């Protein structure tokens, strides 16, 4: 990178920090609390999305703003999860799916991936033993190619799933080692095996049959009504591509660790302002 490129990036970083400082000023002044209240009162509790999926993007860029390493950004992002789940639950949303780690993310530097795996292991154990999780009867599940994860992470996931398997008040799905295209490929392979064994005929294959063979098959409301992506990127990045055919998409400029309740409420309000046609 040339000197002009470095200067440009530095100015961009400074600009983001100014915005963050401004957000903090608003928080401290109480203006955002007033706006939050206005948004909350504007939301129709009878027209909430049943399932909200979130692409939690921007951890590394948030770390750059603070002059920290990437792990710091991932740590902040993991801490943000608890807050967002509380916002969703308190609002009356039933299901939240979080895109935590894609199959493509394995291509990142080994040191970063290793630290992420340590963080995932720690957080799954924390979730499983969290008093709030049990008080509100939250069911926790991981979806993806779990077999690709280190054994210690698989063990932590199993522990969290076992500890919460009998709950049905609120559902949290963690998409980890997940890829939407791979999910469809895996579903097709399972169906092909059943055709080969004579259990089903090719003519039996339809949308409902494919639904039953996806990672999300046993989830309540498997198709998200609303998908939120943070960081300003406007794409779904191989996330729930089968299930999101009629999802409403909401893109938010703020990085995931800096995501605020007011941003969440704005996404829900925006969802309620749209007319869902489902292809009609």
UniProtKB/Swiss-Prot annotation:
Co-factor: note: Binds 2 magnesium ions per subunit.
Binding positions for substrate per the UniProt entry: 58-61, 70, 74, 102-104, 106, 108, 229, 235-237
Signal peptide: none
EC number: 2.5.1.89
Ligand binding (Mg(2+)): 57, 248
Protein name, UniProt field: Tritrans,polycis-undecaprenyl-diphosphate synthase (geranylgeranyl-diphosphate specific)
Similarity annotation: Belongs to the UPP synthase family.
Subunit structure: Homodimer.
Any one biological process term the GO annotation gives: polyprenol biosynthetic process
Gene Ontology molecular function terms on file: magnesium ion binding; prenyltransferase activity
Domain of life: Archaea
PANTHER family, per the entry: DEHYDRODOLICHYL DIPHOSPHATE SYNTHASE COMPLEX SUBUNIT DHDDS (PTHR10291:SF43), DEHYDRODOLICHYL DIPHOSPHATE SYNTHASE FAMILY MEMBER (PTHR10291)
The protein's required cofactors: Mg(2+)
Underlying gene: uppS
Role, per record: Catalyzes the sequential condensation of isopentenyl diphosphate (IPP) with geranylgeranyl diphosphate (GGPP) to yield (2Z,6Z,10Z,14Z,18Z,22Z,26Z,30E,34E,38E)-undecaprenyl diphosphate (tritrans,heptacis-UPP). It is probably the precursor of glycosyl carrier lipids.
Keywords: Magnesium, Metal-binding, Transferase
Residues forming the catalytic site: 57, 105
SUPFAM superfamilies: Undecaprenyl diphosphate synthase
This protein's record includes keyword Nucleotide-binding: no
Chemical reaction(s) catalysed: geranylgeranyl diphosphate + 7 isopentenyl diphosphate = tri-trans,hepta-cis-undecaprenyl diphosphate + 7 diphosphate
